[in-house]
Design a protein with these regions (language model features):
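Glycoside hydrolase catalytic-domain context in secreted enzymes
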Residues: 1-80, 88-98, 103, 125-562
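Short beta-strand elements
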Residues: 105-127
Length: 562
């Protein structure tokens, strides 16, 4: 392992590592670079082994060598101080940078010294390219939990790992717990300074006119001015496995399909070939392979007329029983995030937007739609649970996110402004749409709350009053407009619009559905005609024949004049 080199202008750090195949057969190997940061007892919590970056060799024949250059950003050495600075901090001291065969076994080690502590807390000194300063957003998610600390050589181990003594939420957290039953849109607007947006304008633009334009291009305002409130509600509410056509602006009905390792259309039953699981892709440590995975998804999406892919998924493997472990990559956020970023880049190079999911802290399937609350602290969130998503957005360039069913502390993840606005959009600079996980209400999902707090599209397959924004004041309509912008921006930059404005068409399954529905209606009408005819025939047969010169008396009996 060479000495560490640093580009002070960009913050890029690197080391050269030579790998030699000393075995008897050809094979590949992985170079993993870790750091062991300086730790002060009782100070910022730090792990002694943190994966910074990795690379994989080519196929090496016996006796063959290859020198790999492994790079990472200096900011990756920083830790998040959620207690005092409430920001990322790169503490002064010696950082042990090592090449390892795994997180435990050191092969070679160098020292990198930071002379002065650096706190990333000003607009001209943000962490890892953040657009704004990263600061505490999730204090309420900490809950009534004792977290394990390294202080005193893990002196609180017994307390932190003891069984809970109470299964009741504190009154303070109960007071903050938000669901549909206690959500008040009017109260949410109390301090709003929003003005009513223009709607229904006749500017003559179609969505294809904006393909490839920046998110903030002035033409977007002109296009959005053309939408009516009804059209915007249609757009955000019918997001089950695609987004609907809006003919007035040339918006196609596009298909988005599920499958972490394939593409599966729930309506047509058509699926692509299956690819290896996320766990297998992560285990290869092969970025090129992950990119090829995304490329294959993109190619098959074209064959299936698909625009969006409900994957990759990148929550953390915390324990063996998590219900979605098969979809998630790793217990390490850098490994997971790096592989995810390559899959996204591969798919999006083919014009297919990948929904990075389930954002965030999705950890179990049991009770997943029963207001399941996940509790953690800010440092763990930023350094572990959000980190792979951050890499997927910043390095992978993700344009779509699927939020999670669970709560983060007392707030639903799919309507959490700290997560979806402050961190995702403001800090990381995400541009695109946020889709809910399956939308069926569950007592806490409603479109009004979701769109006001950073969500955009409801993964709904049936019409429900809660899937539209019903409080149509200035703030409500502004939220609809923002959500519409995010959806339309993502779709306009998909392969469906790569050649400009296409003809507004429908999917084959929609026509099939209409034909089946029409046939059913005609069959019912035919049965109704048959039933009416039979009824009239029976009624005619039941009429009493009255002979000439007969009359009916008041009692209804028949009399005949002699």
């Amino acid at each position: 392992m060479s000495d560490i080199s640093v580009d002070e202008a960009t913050g890029t750090m690197s080391a050269d590592v030579t790998v030699t195949n000393t075995g008897q057969v050809a094979g590949k190997d992985i170079v993993q670079i870790y750091d062991n940061p300086p730790y002060t007892d009782g100070g910022i919590e730090k792990a002694s082994a943190n994966l910074l970056s990795y690379e994989k060799t080519k196929l090496l024949e016996p006796g063959e060598s290859e020198t790999l250059t492994v790079t990472w950003n200096r900011d990756s050495l920083a830790s998040y101080d959620a207690v005092n600075a409430k920001a990322y901090v790169l503490e002064a001291g010696d950082y042990k940078i090592s090449a390892r065969s795994n997180s435990h076994d050191v092969i070679d080690e160098k020292t990198y010294t930071v002379d002065v502590t650096q706190t990333f807390n000003t607009a001209d000194n943000t962490h890892d390219g953040d657009k704004v300063v990263a600061t505490n957003q999730f204090d309420d998610a900490k809950g009534d939990v004792t977290y394990l600390s390294r202080a005193g050589r893990f002196a609180n181990l017994a307390e932190a790992t003891a069984a809970p003594t109470s299964f009741e939420m504190s009154e303070a957290n109960k007071a903050k717990f938000l669901a549909t039953s206690n959500y008040d849109a009017a109260a949410a607007d109390a301090d709003s300074s929003a003005t009513m947006p223009t709607t229904g304008a006749k500017n003559g633009l179609v969505l294809g006119d904006l393909a490839g334009l920046d998110y903030d291009d002035p033409k977007w305002d002109q296009l959005l001015d053309q939408l009516t409130v009804k059209e915007m509600n249609t757009l955000i509410s019918k997001g089950g496995y695609g987004s609907p056509a809006i003919s007035s602006i040339g918006k196609l009905r596009v298909s988005d399909v599920d499958g972490p390792a394939s593409l599966n259309n729930n309506f047509t039953g058509v699926g692509s070939i299956g690819l290896p699981s996320a766990v297998s892709v992560a285990a290869t440590f092969n970025k090129e392979l992950a990119h090829s995975f995304g490329d294959a998804i993109g190619t098959m999406a074209h064959d299936m007329q698909v625009s969006g892919w409900y994957a990759p998924a990148t929550n953390t493997h915390r324990y063996a029983y998590a219900g979605r472990n098969f979809e998630y990559f790793s217990e390490d956020p850098v490994l997971a995030g790096s592989q995810v970023a390559e899959e996204i880049k591969g798919a999006q190079a083919k014009g297919v937007y990948a929904f990075l999911k389930h954002f965030a802290l999705n950890d179990q399937e049991t009770n997943r739609t029963h207001m399941l609350a996940t509790w953690t602290n800010e440092q763990a969130m930023r350094e572990i649970y959000l980190r792979s998503f951050e890499i997927g957005v910043k390095d992978g360039g993700a344009h779509a996110i699927m939020s999670a069913f669970n709560y983060i502390g007392p707030e639903y993840a799919g309507a959490n402004p700290a997560l979806l606005k402050n961190v995702l959009r403001d800090e990381w600079g995400f541009r695109g749409m946020v889709l809910t996980d399956y939308f069926a209400g569950y007592g806490y999902q409603n479109a009004d709350q979701i769109t006001r707090n950073g969500g955009d599209l409801m993964l709904a397959t049936i019409d429900m009053p809660i899937s539209t924004v019903n409080v149509q004041d200035a703030a409500g309509v502004s939220s609809l407009r923002r959500a519409s912008h995010n959806i339309l921006y993502t779709v306009a930059n998909s392969w469906m619009y790569e050649n400009g404005q296409p003809e507004v068409t429908r999917n084959a399954w929609e026509y099939i559905t209409w034909v089946v529905a029409a046939a059913a209606i005609l069959a019912l009408l035919g049965l109704e005609v048959v039933a009416i005819r039979r009824y009239r025939t029976r009624k005619a047969e039941a009429v009493i024949t009255v002979e000439p010169n007969a009359s009916i008396d008041e009692a209804g009996s028949e009399t005949v004049e002699e």
